[in-house]
Amino acid sequence: MYNLYCTYMTGKRENVLIEALPYIREFHDSVMVIKVGGHAMVDPQVMSDIVQDIVLLRFVGIHPVIVHGGGPEITEKMDRMGKKSEFIGGLRITDDETMEIARMVLVGNINTRIVSLISKHGGKGVGLSGKDGNMILAKKKPTQKILIEDIEHDVDLGWVGDTEIINPEIINIVTANGYIPVISPIAMDSEGNALNINADTVAGDLADALNAKKLILMTDVPGVLRDQTDISTRISRIGVDEVEQLIEDGVLSGGMIPKMRSAKASVEGGVDRVHVIDGSISHSVLLELFTDQGIGTMVYKDTK
C-alpha cells in the first residue's frame, strides 16, 4: 500500500491526472460524507493534507460533508484533568463531566480548527453540531450487558445516544451555497439534553439521509486487517454480509466495530460504497477516490 503511494508521488503527473478524470466525471455533483478522526487529528500536517483534499473535492464539483471525531483529544483532556476514560464496545462511557469535556473539545476546539484549515486552503467552511437546526435528534442508549468473570452486568453508558431522526435541511442549504459543513457528533434528545454519538455512526446516518454517493471513514490503520500486526493482510473488499462474521471471528474489535457496523448500515441504506482508509497517509482521500487500486477497505453490497 505504501509502495502504491510512492508510485503515485513519483510517477508521471499527467498519468495521475488522466487516471483521476473518469472518477471526477462520475462523482461530479454528488455528496460525499467524510468522517475525520483518529490520531491523524493531532498531527497538524496530516490534518492539513486531509482538509486540502476535501477542499479540492469541492472545487471539482463534489459536495463534501465533514463529520469529525476527537477521541484521542478527549482522552488527553480527561487525562490532564485526572479523569479516567472507560469504553464499552468501542463507545465512551459519558457522565456529566465527560459530556462537558467532549463538547468543549469537539465543538470549541476541533470544529473551529477544521473550519480555519478549510479557509486556509481556499475553501469556505461552516461549523455545526448535531444540535444546530435540530439536525440530529437522538435518544439515550439503553444499558449494555457485559461479562465480568463470567457474570453478566448491566452498564449505563451515560450521555451516549442513538440517532432517531436526521433533519438534513441545514446541510443542504450550506452545501447549495458552496460551503463545506463541518459537523461535531453532539446531538440532542427530546428534552434538550446533549448526547454524545459515535462519529462513525453519525457519518453513516448523515450519508443515508443525504443520499450520499460515498462515505469515507478514516482510521489509524490501513483498512481492515486480518492480522493487526501485518499490514499485508489488509482486506481490500468486504461485502455487507461478512461484517458480523468478522466481528464474531475477532477480526473486528474495539472502535472498528461501530465503524464497520456504520459502514454496513450505510450500504444497506443506499450509499453506493463505504471506504475505510488510513487517514495518516498523505492525501489518502484523493488516493482512495481517484486511483484504480485505492489504499483502504471498501464495503459494498454483495448482489450475488
UniProtKB/Swiss-Prot annotation:
Q: What class of enzyme is it?
A: transferase
Which reaction is this enzyme known to catalyze? N-acetyl-L-glutamate + ATP = N-acetyl-L-glutamyl 5-phosphate + ADP
Positions binding substrate in this chain are 70-71, 92, 196
Q: Where in the cell is it found?
A: Cytoplasm
Instruction: Please give the InterPro entries that the UniProt record associates with this protein.
Output: AceGlu_kinase-like_sf (IPR036393), AcgluKinase_fam (IPR004662), ArgB (IPR037528), Asp/Glu/Uridylate_kinase (IPR001048), Glu/AcGlu_kinase (IPR001057), NAGK-C (IPR041727)
- Assigned keywords, A-Z: Amino-acid biosynthesis, Arginine biosynthesis, ATP-binding, Cytoplasm, Kinase, Nucleotide-binding, Transferase
Q: GO terms for molecular function, please?
A: acetylglutamate kinase activity; ATP binding
Residue(s) at site: Transition state stabilizer = 35, 259
State a GO cellular component annotated for this protein: cytoplasm
Keyword Amino-acid biosynthesis listed? The answer is: yes
Q: Does the keyword Lipoprotein apply?
A: no
In which pathway is this protein known to take part?
Amino-acid biosynthesis; L-arginine biosynthesis; N(2)-acetyl-L-ornithine from L-glutamate: step 2/4
State its Enzyme Commission number(s). Answer: 2.7.2.8
Q: Name one GO biological process term.
A: L-arginine biosynthetic process
Major subcellular location class: cytoplasm
What is the protein's known function? Catalyzes the ATP-dependent phosphorylation of N-acetyl-L-glutamate.
Say which family it is in. Answer: Belongs to the acetylglutamate kinase family. ArgB subfamily.
Q: Which PANTHER family match?
A: N-ACETYLGLUTAMATE SYNTHASE (PTHR23342), N-ACETYLGLUTAMATE SYNTHASE, MITOCHONDRIAL (PTHR23342:SF0)
Record's protein name: Acetylglutamate kinase
Recorded source organism is Methanococcoides burtonii (strain DSM 6242 / NBRC 107633 / OCM 468 / ACE-M)
Q: Which gene encodes it?
A: argB
